[in-house]
Amino acid sequence: MADVPHVPSVMTADELHETVATIVALQQPSGMIPWFVGGHCDPWNHVETAMALDIAGLHTRAELAYQWLVDTQSPQGWWHNYYMPSGAVSDHKIDSNVCAYIAAGVWHHWLHTSDRAFVEHVWPTVKSAVNFVVSMARHDGTILWAQHPGERPWDFALLTGSSSIAHSLRCACHIAALLRHDHTNWSNALERLEHVIRNDVSAFEPKLRWAMDWYYPVLAGVVTGDAAANMLNDRWDEFVIPGKGVRCVHDEPWVTAAETAECALSLSAIGETERARELLECTRLHRDVDGAYWTGIVYPQVIRFPVGERSAYTSAAVILAAESIAGDTMASRLFWADDHPMHV
């Protein structure tokens, strides 16, 4: 059994394996991992769950998950937003952030396995996806959110999605450097995107209600140091319910375990490890008896919402945060703001 993160009061090593078993149970023969039984799969959260498989040492299953992305990618480099286990497309939208995230997942896989042959195998897929995403960049550095197949991209960008894209672009540059490929165009796109995120939030569609717009520039390693700490502290009381976790939106008492885990990951990324652990401990309230995690809880009634939903991506987010807090592998540094490891 592989060594896995062990974070007392959050998730023991044995509990992590229990949680990953609930993700494995969802994985289809094709490699696809839907949100829940009978649910859809989106490529972003699919990558998140693949990373959880790698953390548990299930590298063959993680590679099967990435192979599903190889097999379903369009010739233009994109994926649709939602797929069903049958292979049918349930949402045809093309989301730039969804398409970019494979780079973060593949870099994470490399940090766990040092399997150069696998990275070379998926390189054409990563390259095509990242080139597509960069093609959606505007002159100001922002990257347009989405489009429908064959249509022009929508004319606005999102702060959360763009921050995640910045992290994915950084990972893509690491992969390119590992394989000795030129990545000048990607590096330039990353520099422009980071500049606008740090200096002109008005360039993005306002989504101030949403917790992800609050912490994602920190999680993605775009805003760092004192500025990152200030960003998290400034709206902490708006989004965090003490002892419960992070609200999905600041004006509703709906706490989601994934947002709680991602916010904890943001704290870990800037070195606030103990504060991250304390926040991630709140996700224990979402843990079910078999190790799966309920997506959200509404307070004070303690109503699980969406009703009956235990999502694989939620479990994966908790595992990723636990890995970062444990900090005992190179892969745990994936989101660390001051440590973007090349190791080529």
Across the structure, where does each feature detected by a protein language model lie?
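N-terminal beta1-alpha1-beta2 module of alpha/beta enzyme domains
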Residues: 26, 35, 39-47, 51, ...
